[in-house]
């Protein structure tokens, strides 16, 4: 068990930010502490439970595992207040969005999992994406046990999904997106797209390579670049971001001013639009 006091880290905001789909709340009424948030996270085949009350965080893992893996995964070595300090104080909309999502972090997630997750995300919503991912993992992922003896499932490898026909994944509620996942898995297994090489590529080259995968468009490629490869200059534009741009940045978002951190600001905007924009309150 590792206890930390962490600034600009809110596990609930991260969970609801649309960047990760295997982070879910834990409800145990018998020992609930008022004001405490509990989450379970499955990442890179690992299982973690987090308890957070304000800035106080308890990570249910060893100090060694926290230092070597989870600190990196949650990007805890980065001072996000530096990013927020770069926001133009005259931009009241962006200032407000950052304040509402000040606990956001850009997670360092698995590349293959993000490819599948954002292929599934097209014309979809967060609860349904989570359910689809859960179905795939339960059906085709390796079963594992956490420290409490509870089972969870690893994310299935490309080699596993490449062997399926599209109808098999349709049974996991993927619908027409099934063909995207199966064909992308086959492209990776056949060596047409090399994930190890993509991990080493700069942003634009990585995006270009990801676009070779069936079903991957610019928005999906940018999501993968941001949430798996940590290319913070990636700026995915979905319907929420498009609406924000139309309303608040008619001349275009000032990417030059925010060069290198555009993706962080995109997450503040996305989270705000999803949870706090007029009509959401």
What are these model-predicted stretches?
Residues 1-281:
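HhH-family (HhH-GPD) DNA N-glycosylase catalytic core used in base-excision repair
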